[in-house]
Design a protein with these regions (language model features):
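Metal-dependent polysaccharide deacetylase catalytic core of the NodB/CE4 family, i.e.
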Residues: 1-106, 110
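C-terminal domain-boundary segment and adjacent tail
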Residues: 113-154
Length: 154
C-alpha cells in the first residue's frame, strides 16, 4: 500500500471486515470504517475520506454514516466484471467499450486475468482520457447524484 500511495495513487476505504453494510447499523459501519482508516493512516500517514462499501452494497444508512463521519461515499460507473474465471479479453472489452469521460472503472487485484490485461486497458484508454484520482474527478459540494450513481454539478 505504501508503494502505491508513494506513486501518487489515492487510497480509499473499502471497509475492514468486508461486511454487507446494508445489513448493519450506522454505528457498526462507522466503527468498521474507523478501523480500516487507522490502518491506512498508519501506513500512508493520511486518513482516507473516500469510501466504497463492499460489493457496492449501499443504502441511505450507508451514505449517511459515511457523511456523518466526514467521509464521502463513492461508487463505480463501469464494472470490468473481472472476478472469478473472467477471460482477459472480456475484461478488456467491458472496461474499454463502456468507458466514457468521468467514469470510475471497477477492477480487482488478485483476480485471475486482471493484472495481465490491465496494461492493454490502460494503453487503450490513455489515448482518449486523462487519468486522475477520484478526489480530482468528483465534485465536493453543490452536486446531485442521479439514480445511476452519476454525479452532476447543480
Amino acid at each position: 500500500m505504501k508503494k502505491i500511495y508513494d506513486r501518487g495513487h489515492e487510497i480509499g476505504n473499502h471497509s475492514y471486515s468486508h461486511a454487507d453494510y446494508t445489513k448493519i447499523s450506522a454505528e457498526a459501519i462507522t466503527a468498521d470504517l474507523d478501523k480500516c482508516d487507522g490502518i491506512v493512516e498508519s501506513i500512508t500517514g493520511e486518513r482516507p475520506y473516500l469510501m466504497r462499501a463492499p460489493s457496492g452494497g449501499y443504502n441511505n444508512t450507508v451514505v449517511k454514516a459515511a457523511e456523518d463521519s466526514g467521509r464521502m461515499y463513492i461508487q463505480w460507473s463501469v464494472d470490468g466484471i473481472d472476478y472469478g474465471d473472467a477471460e482477459a479479453q472480456d475484461i478488456y472489452e467491458r472496461s474499454v467499450r463502456r468507458t466514457q469521460n468521468g467514469d470510475i472503472i471497477l477492477l480487482h487485484n488478485g483476480t485471475k486475468n486482471t493484472a495481465a490485461i490491465l496494461p492493454k486497458i490502460l494503453e487503450a484508454l490513455e489515448c482518449k482520457y486523462e487519468f486522475v484520482t477520484v478526489s480530482e474527478l468528483i465534485y465536493k459540494d453543490n452536486y446531485v447524484i442521479d439514480n445511476t450513481g452519476r454525479q452532476f454539478q447543480k
